[in-house]
Amino acid sequence: MGRLRAFLLFSGTLAVISTVHADFNCSQAPDSDMVQTCHMLQEWDSAARKAIRKRQAFNAGAPGVQGFSPSNPPRFAPSAQGCMNIACICPYMGGRMANGCILPNGQPYLMAYRKEYRMMSDNERQRWHNALIQLKRSGEYDRLSVMHRQVGSASGAHSGPGFLVWHREYMKRMEIALRMIDPGISMPYWDSVLESYLPDPRDSIMFGPQFMGMTDASGQLVSGPFAGFRTLEGRPNIIRRMATEGKMFTEQNINNLMAQNDLVSVMAFTAPQGGCPFRPYFGALEYTHASIHLWMGGDMKPPSTSANDPVFFLHHTFVDFIWEMWRQNHQNRFARENQYPPDIAACANSQHFSYAQMRPWDKINRDGLSNAYTDNLYHYAPRPTCNRNNANCGSQYLFCDTRGNPHCVAKVKPGGLCRGFEGLDSCYMGTCVAGWCRGGQQFQQPAQTTAVATVQQPQQQPQQQQPQQQRPATTPQSNCYNEDPCCNQWSRQNECRTNTVYMNRYCRKSCGLCQSNDNNRGCHDRHISCAYWRGQNFCTRRRQWMAENCQATCGWCNMNEAQLCASVARQSRRVRRNAKFWLTEPDADDFVDDFMLDYGR
């Protein structure tokens, strides 16, 4: 009953809030970029509120259940990308658990170690590029990009506290997808503060052919590893229109955020309505990160197209890193997993509420607070630094500006503007002469040093590139499932045609909406991770899904399909239906589903 107590306690807390500020206006933003960002966030929030009302107009019910049905659980679609620890991921990799996960080639599967993009070795960077290209060719990159497009302007992913938790889960899923191709790589982050010191960040090595590539006069990405990436909209190349608006992250942005002690200044209400007792903090990550989207322009500007550009994932990995730095500095372990801004409809649409579903996944927003992300799956390499005693940033693509407070800066690509950095090693493969990078190698940066020797991927990791062994473990069987043992029976009763909304969501296999290679008959497991899910008590907590897909592991081989439908699944629905209760918030159905998921089955 922990969640219910927390909900009731929180409801009482909301009742004592009495100080209400005047209506918020975007003209209060500190500059034109923030004004534009503010208006966009408000537009997306308005669209989200309309979408909630539209969704409430019709709630699909299971066959035989009229109207709103508490028997409708959130979608449960287990996959490697949904895992929260290595033990869960290991079977998808074809590995075995023996003092950790051992891959088929004998190498261990380790936590990801996320480095700044320029701090990767050339080999690491090339392998990451290759994995991303393979992901694009397979169609999985586009499938993940579609997820962001679908939540771009009417969801809990933008315009409120859900922004950080949603994108944390999203970055995790992209990283796991890439590691299914090459288990030894990790998602890099782009510390755009390194560009903020340059007279023209467009001339950074970041936008050279070795990294994110270069654009032509029309803004099309025509060089670099991702040239020729067709967009979701069908354009032959990614579009960038850099530096017409917006700006890079600055060290001051990060310092300002780190100085905040109040959670709602970080997981902020960025599109409040009249009556919200919290004023927006324009130094919040959702605001400041948007300036980089504006600066990149083109596909990166609107959420509907931003994931077309791989730079999106590097940028948001850095956003996640900044958030994690704040968490480590201001919260203990308990607080990190339990502190979430209050659920106030005037401050954020209900898709941002702590117990609202993190659409489109089988999670709730507060799940994104879990320490498991950085305990089990990934951790961050420190940001590049230097000092007067060691003016080496640890990368041939960065240099140390020792004037004033020493700090690392991105090198300028050949022919780029380096004004103000004459006499420093500011040019990649060249020298800064009269404000421009000229050919030549006057400065020789040492090879990578101990600044990056803390990488926890051992030297043998390059041998782990075995996509042919990894991919078949997931691709054929991870997506096509029914979510209820009654699906086949309902399909025979023509429910796929007469109850399409429900059946298309929960009975995709029986309705022929996907293809499965599971042709086995009799009592068996359809999913590769049934043993793991049983260990998580899912035979009790997810009875319907497990009865359909993990019958053998859950010990239900003494029942045929009709008996499973009549007893296991319907018993679960009957308990949920008897415990049904109503809330007043627009996403009450999501809260009911998630509450009952843990306590009603």
UniProtKB/Swiss-Prot annotation:
Stretches assigned to the ShKT domain: 480-514, 523-557
Residues where Cu cation B binds: H289, H293, H316
Intrachain disulfide bonds: C480-C514, C487-C507, C496-C511, C523-C557, C530-C550, C539-C554
Cofactor note: Binds 2 copper ions per subunit.
Superkingdom to which the source organism belongs: Eukaryota
Residues bound to Cu cation A: H148, H158, H167
Range of residues in the leader sequence: 1-22
Coiled coil start-end: none
Pfam families linked: ShK (PF01549), Tyrosinase (PF00264)
Positions glycosylated per UniProt: N25
Record key words, sorted: Copper, Disulfide bond, Glycoprotein, Metal-binding, Monooxygenase, Oxidoreductase, Repeat, Signal
Single GO MF annotation: monooxygenase activity
Cofactor(s) this protein cannot do without: Cu(2+)
Record-linked InterPro entries: Di-copper_centre_dom_sf, ShKT_dom, Tyrosinase/Hemocyanin, Tyrosinase_Cu-bd
Region (Disordered): 453-477
Protein family according to the UniProt entry: Belongs to the tyrosinase family.
Identification of the protein by name: Putative tyrosinase-like protein tyr-1
